[in-house]
């Protein structure tokens, strides 16, 4: 399958949140073990003006990868126990990233099940913290890019517009009016149900 190149990621964050749906996220572990998940849910986060974003007050040591080149991974730690995985989207020094909220496991499910402690396919990657745990991603991977080999995205047919849902972002206290969550309608792997 064709790997996505840098040009794919050089689009506005809100567009990337939609464009990522259906694409395959790949992690190559030591020993060439392959893990794959189909992206079925995302959320867009900008910088200045987006109070739900880590970068809305500017650049810090913690959020610095969010200001890197498009296609960079931004991984952060929350609640003292969870890692969340984002893909940087805006030009360098302009904050923007897409949070990977849910995936459908495609390859390496045995490893993912051991990582997660569950054999439920619909629950393996049905949330941003579950994705990081299933793929064994942590803060040490923040700043990695999607072009050097350990991580990359594979192309897949574009999801038709009538199969893409939109809602407000989940688990935030500010910016809830913004409809910046995107998801594949009907997927059993979503982090939360679809809005009625």
Swiss-Prot record:
Its EC number is 3.2.2.-. GO terms for biological process: base-excision repair. The keyword Membrane does not apply. Keywords: DNA damage, DNA repair, Hydrolase. It holds the Pfam family Pur_DNA_glyco. GO terms for molecular function: alkylbase DNA N-glycosylase activity; DNA binding. The keyword DNA damage applies. Belongs to the DNA glycosylase MPG family. This is Putative 3-methyladenine DNA glycosylase. It comes from Chlorobium phaeovibrioides (strain DSM 265 / 1930).
